């Protein structure tokens, strides 16, 4: 059973697992667009992670649960993050324990550790210290604590901490910043693109989930990411693959932060997420150097290089009408 099946990761996961012979069931909200799942023979159970009865019905009879549902924004009050990412997770864990599932894969994020000092390599042992204003990271950290507690009580759980997802069907965060802004000729680069980002091609994430189902060690956490690269390197690869020049307007940190403050002020009155939310700051102005050797050794996880993932992502943008 998969939660979050109509989301960015979930859609790619259903496509991948269906092509590898898995029988899939998904918990979907009444308002979700499920047309994208029709090709993957997914059994749909209508409900919500906030409704324990519907979660129990979705889990019943399933061997595995992949909990990929999450409320992910870079802006907004804490309540929706807490509701979905903490209480929703509690409901799915409770149902999985009650139904005796064989394995529970919890999808988390590397950002639960918070930004690190320059040169620090992030491993699974890096303490959780989410950025104070990042309600998403804080709620995902709490969700991990819940998973650990249920594991201690006998539910076989594995936590996968994903890097910055990009790839087909994505339009937010990494996809927007590195692909869509560029394809719309918005050529901004902060700090000469020197900081390090931790991309994760979404199909690699799907492969890692299957590997965790087969080979993951119960009770463990695994970092799942491609090789960490600089913003400048990512921009250069995307530009070259798209056949466009790699020029960028360099924006100093102080100017970008002032611009972000203005956008936040406008958002306060408009009630709409700003184009550059404040919580992008830890991603853009810090280095995220991630060690995935544990997943490579225990899950046999082999990430794509960014060149290949970016090429496939640009192919997808071309298929939906972008001028690439």
State where each predicted segment sits.
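NAD(P)H-binding glycine-rich loop region in Rossmannoid oxidoreductase-like domains
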Residues: 31-38, 42-87, 95, 115
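NAD(P)-dependent short-chain dehydrogenase/reductase
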Residues: 150-197, 202, 238
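Mid/C-terminal beta-alpha module of Rossmann-like enzyme folds, strongest
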Residues: 211-275, 292, 311-314, 321-324
């Amino acid at each position: 059973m998969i939660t979050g099946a109509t989301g960015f990761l979930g859609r790619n996961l259903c496509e991948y697992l269906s092509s590898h012979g898995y029988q899939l069931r998904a918990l979907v909200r009444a308002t979700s667009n499920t047309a994208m799942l029709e090709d993957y023979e997914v059994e749909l159970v209508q409900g919500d992670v906030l409704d324990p009865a519907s979660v129990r019905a979705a889990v019943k009879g399933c061997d595995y649960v992949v909990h990929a549902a999450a409320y992910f924004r870079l802006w907004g009050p804490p309540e929706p993050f807490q509701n979905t990412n903490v209480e929703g997770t509690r409901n799915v864990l409770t149902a999985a324990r009650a139904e005796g599932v064989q394995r529970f894969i919890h999808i988390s994020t590397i950002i639960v550790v918070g930004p690190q000092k320059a040169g620090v390599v992030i491993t699974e042992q890096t303490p959780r210290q989410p950025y104070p204003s990042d309600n998403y990271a804080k709620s995902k950290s709490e969700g991990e604590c819940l998973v650990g507690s249920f594991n201690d009580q006998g539910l076989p759980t594995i936590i996968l901490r994903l890097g910055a997802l990009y790839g087909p069907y994505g339009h937010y965060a990494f996809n927007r910043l590195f692909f869509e802004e560029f394809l719309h000729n918005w050529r901004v680069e902060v700090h000469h693109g020197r900081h390090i980002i931790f991309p994760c091609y979404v199909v690699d994430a799907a492969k890692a989930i299957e590997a965790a189902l087969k080979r993951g060690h119960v009770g463990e956490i695994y970092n799942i990411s491609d090789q960490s690269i600089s913003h400048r390197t990512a921009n250069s690869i995307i530009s070259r693959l798209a056949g466009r020049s790699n020029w960028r307007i360099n924006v100093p940190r102080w100017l970008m932060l002032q611009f972000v403050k203005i956008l936040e002020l406008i958002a306060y009155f408009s009630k709409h997420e700003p184009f550059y939310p404040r919580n992008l700051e830890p991603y853009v102005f810090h280095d995220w150097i991630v060690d995935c050797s544990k997943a490579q050794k225990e899950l046999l996880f082999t990430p794509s290089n960014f060149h290949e993932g970016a090429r496939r992502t640009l192919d997808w943008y071309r298929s939906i009408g972008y001028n690439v």
